[in-house]
Swiss-Prot record:
MF terms in GO: metal ion binding; oxidoreductase activity
Organism taxonomic ancestry: Bacteria, Pseudomonadati, Pseudomonadota, Gammaproteobacteria, Pseudomonadales
Binding site for heme b: Y38, H194, N226, Y317, K318
EC number(s) from the headed UniProt entry: 1.14.13.238
Class of this enzyme: oxidoreductase
Protein name per Swiss-Prot or TrEMBL: Heme-dependent oxidative N-demethylase alpha subunit
Annotated binding of dimethylamine, by residue: E266
Tree of life domain: Bacteria
Role played: Component of the heme-dependent oxidative N-demethylase (HODM) enzyme, that catalyzes the NADPH-dependent oxidation of dimethylamine (DMA) to methylamine (MA) and formaldehyde. Functions in bacterial methylated amine catabolism, linking alkylamine oxidation to the tetrahydrofolate C1 pool. The alpha subunit of HODM binds heme, oxygen and DMA, and serves as the site of the oxidative N-demethylase activity.
Species for this entry: Ectopseudomonas mendocina (strain ymp) (Pseudomonas mendocina)
């Protein structure tokens, strides 16, 4: 698949973000059934379906340049969105190495990496970056290594320290979260940062997930899909910016639901870092408006059924309740059996 980047689009203010027909076709629709309930739903992150979001371990798409501009803007306003605790320095270099290696291998027309021992040469042709540096020496980069590489990667990243039979969120770059804060969750254990999720704890979902994640081996990453809904194509729906987007849920009407409401899907990747034994948790976000989504009749029909029958506690947690009935009524026309 030839990768072409779209001209600069915005994820705020005028919200000029749109998906091309090709981007719609490869959107990772997250519902395999007409009903949704929490599950671990992890699978090996092996390459499949050429051209899809599952072809490469770290997906780069047409929105790359726009997303990197959005990340830079968020960091300019709030540098604390990137955090690395002192004991995570090796894991930060580990992350840089993994991301550079994958980008250069999977997208050689846009990224290049050459190495001679610790002397590395990185070229990001998409963003016009040409950097020679010494691996392991932070003074040879313009900023801390985790920040440096994640300023060039779509999606958020948490780097989890594994100790005492648990995982701790001790580093990360989070500028496009679905209503959570790295600043707040920093240092928390796996169950602590998942504590707001309703129903799943009683079902044992997180006990099973933690046991699985602790045993992930180097070279055997796993992935899963997660989802929510977002009003407008806004990437930064963080608690820190709630004053900018919190009221948007009250603006949904029968006339604008297709334009305003976006299905927000996270392709979550968990990969063991070889030098530090930390776990890299990638959260790659995809947005699609309902107007775009219903161009696929099967998706439109299924989304109607999922939203109609979604358990109330899950709808509340995902922030859907306020406009849920408007959404279901609008989607009903796309379900022949409704």
């Amino acid at each position: 698949m030839t990768l072409t980047f779209k001209p600069l689009e915005s994820y705020r203010e005028d919200f000029s973000f749109r998906n091309s027909p090709a981007a719609i076709a490869r959107f990772p629709f997250p519902f395999p059934e007409d009903q949704y309930m929490y599950s671990v739903n992890l699978e090996p992150a092996v390459s499949r379906d050429p051209g899809s979001v599952f072809e490469h371990q770290f997906d780069v798409d047409e929105h790359y340049v726009s997303e990197m501009a959005e990340r830079a803007r968020v960091l300019e306003l709030d540098p604390g969105r990137c955090l690395v605790m002192p004991h995570m320095a090796q894991a930060a270099w580990d992350t840089l190495a993994m991301l550079m290696e994958h980008l250069a291998r999977d997208y050689p027309q846009h990224f290049r990496l050459t190495r001679q021992g610790d002397a590395w040469h990185w070229q990001n042709l998409a963003l016009g970056i040409d950097q020679r540096f010494t691996f392991g020496d932070p003074a040879s980069l313009p900023c801390e290594p985790l920040e440096y590489i994640t300023r060039q990667m779509q999606g958020d990243f948490a780097v989890l320290d594994q100790r005492d039979g648990d995982l701790f969120m001790d580093a990360g770059m989070v500028t496009c979260p679905a209503d959570w804060s790295l600043r707040f969750d920093a240092g928390m254990s796996f169950k602590q940062w998942h504590s707001p999720v309703p129903m799943a704890h009683q079902m044992g979902v997180f006990d099973r997930a933690l046991k699985y994640l602790l045993n992930i081996q180097v070279g055997a990453p796993v992935r899963r899909l997660n989802w929510t809904l977002t009003i407008n194509p806004r990437l930064d729906t963080s608690p820190e910016t709630y004053h900018e987007w919190g009221n948007d849920r009250g603006k949904v009407t029968p006339d604008n639901v297709g334009r305003l409401v976006h299905l927000r899907v996270e392709l979550q990747l968990m990969a063991r870092l070889p030098r530090s034994n930390a776990l890299l948790f990638g959260i790659r976000t995809y947005l699609i408006s309902l107007d775009e989504l219903v161009s696929n009749p099967a998706w439109a029909q299924r989304l109607h059924r999922v939203m109609r029958d979604l358990p109330d506690p899950i709808a509340d947690y995902k922030g859907i309740t306020r406009y849920r009935q408007t959404l279901v009524d609008w989607l009903r026309r796309f379900d022949p059996e409704a």
